[in-house]
Amino acid sequence: MNYLKCLKGSSNPDDFVQSWKYKRAFRSEHPEYFDPDGIMVFCGPQGAGKTLSAVQYVIKLAQNYPHMILVSNVAIDDDVLGGVKRYPYTGLQDLSKYNNGYAGVVFLIDEIQIEFNSLESKNIDPVVITEIAQQRKQRKHIVGTSQVFNRIAKPFREQFKYAVMCRNICGFLQINSLVKGEDCMVDEQGNVKTNKVKRFYWFHTPRIYRAYDTYAKIIRTNTVGYGGGKR
């Protein structure tokens, strides 16, 4: 027997129709279903608008998915979250601590390289990577910011779904370039090289400025290392 034939699946057109009906019925039964997953990191130097862009993105997610919960080290005003439950991010253990079924969990981690430092990449607990790799099944979405792409540990970067390169002009015109993580190559200076880019242009607003504390200091939340030892 040629066991490779076991790789073949159905070629019955009726199965296509039944699969479509199944998925439509599933979404009807679960209107709270959270579509985003994987890791999206906003990158750029200080003043590039990366935190502003990440906060706006999360606020829009909250508007579209009101049943999600948010775990963050950025103090976003509850008024702009529309009633979405918000919890403070306290460390890597939160990635497995918070679950919300089909309704989803968003982790917004400003300066994410503080947690996933490339200089400590050899000490990353495999359990953490396993948790990250299973985000899609658990409807979890990690949104982070980082000044330099390659300061984030490589095992973590390899799990990226998207990276967003941020810059702004005159302090109010935002230009963000979206690239797929699988298409990214990083040079020695930490610059992301890719041919597949989608750009977004938008203006800053006073509302988004007031939505969070732009001058808050991000501290290292974990004092325990990835392998259980002290950092």
Where are these regions (language model features)?
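Conserved nucleotide-sensing/catalytic segment adjacent to the nucleotide-binding pocket
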Residues: 79-138
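Hydrophobic anchor at the beta1->P-loop junction of P-loop NTPases
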Residues: 42
